[in-house]
Curated annotation (Swiss-Prot):
Keywords: Cytoplasm, Elongation factor, GTP-binding, Hydrolase, Magnesium, Metal-binding, Nucleotide-binding, Protein biosynthesis. Belongs to the TRAFAC class translation factor GTPase superfamily. Classic translation factor GTPase family. EF-Tu/EF-1A subfamily. It is found in: Cytoplasm. Residues 90-93 are annotated as: G3. The gene is tuf. GTP binds at residues 13-20, 90-94, 145-148. This is Elongation factor 1-alpha. It comes from Halobacterium salinarum (strain ATCC 700922 / JCM 11081 / NRC-1) (Halobacterium halobium). Residues 184-186 are annotated as: G5. Its EC number is 3.6.5.3.
Amino acid sequence: MSDNRHQNLAVIGHVDHGKSTMVGRLLYETGSVPEHVIEQHKEEAEEKGKGGFEFAYVMDNLAEERERGVTIDIAHQEFTTDEYEFTIVDCPGHRDFVKNMITGASQADNAVLVVAADDGVAPQTREHVFLSRTLGIDELIVAVNKMDVVDYDESKYNEVVSGVKDLFGQVGFNPDDAKFIATSAFEGDNVSDHSDNTPWYDGPTLLEALNGLPVPQPPTDADLRLPIQDVYTISGIGTVPVGRIETGVMNTGDNVSFQPSDVGGEVKTIEMHHEEVPNAEPGDNVGFNVRGIGKDDIRRGDVCGPADDPPSVADTFQAQVVVMQHPSVITAGYTPVFHAHTAQVACTIESIDKKMDPASGETQEENPDFIQSGDAAVVTVRPQKPLSLEPSSEIPELGSFAVRDMGQTIAAGKVLDVDEA
């Protein structure tokens, strides 16, 4: 058993390439799903004419998702290997779920990219790799999945590997840093055991590759940053903000400040899993009570930090963005909604400072008139109402964002510099 070394793992890739099945298979192979649950899912899947979906059913707990055969919200599932305890951040694959992907991937240490052998690099494969790169995921394990569908053909595998390597080159991922694995999540090939169906494949199994990931360094030595997800009023306690600690440590007795609401006080109690704890660390989901703070004083999107070094509030900020899809062009004055940690704020792009080569990061053009899909750029942004952000070089967890408009994610980016209000 691992000594509780923990990894948050994103599972990314195009819709229907087998992400949910892969997650179900990982849970199944590591003994994280009781046998009777799998049997029950099997019966249910067969009744609905979706035989073979039983592993994916493990993931899709919501009835609505089951009916549609689509994974919706980010599902946190856990499994243990020889080296690590993994929490899977199952990243949905459908178009309108990219926002979930961004909030999910930003919580992930590493990612498994699932690419179907019969389909290769698809639009969302491209997009998810782009996002992972922008959001600071360094290690990608690539599962070339559905090998059973292509009769375990080595040439198909090689074709997909070379397509993915080309894609990595375009977004500045080093292809040599990625591990490629020939898998069938459905049949279980090369997930936990080496498969006889792929005698030509001599690389690691998926579980071996996961065990070989580098140890994430929890950002405990950074300043406390805790984006607020919700604020509750609990009788007998009072106002209880809830959120996940991104960096630093929260102790009872700490003096904290909430920004941009600009209120603060002393932490009286901290609760985790309905038990009171003296302190909490990065990755912990906590509810806490602060002396003198009322329900209307703070809101979702506020960030809690130390009173003597409160979270930054941006008057303007400079950011590096990658435009993923926009029907026309983006010019100065454009005001979409920025999603950063738990905040959603309309922000105006005041200026496009330079256009860059997405792969090398070199400047291609100073002060261009516009940017469009596929472009990377540095822009200056003015939030329409106060927004707490940090430069991603200092606190990466509070330095990435998604840009949404017209019901879709049009860009993702990271904060380079904050000009404080």
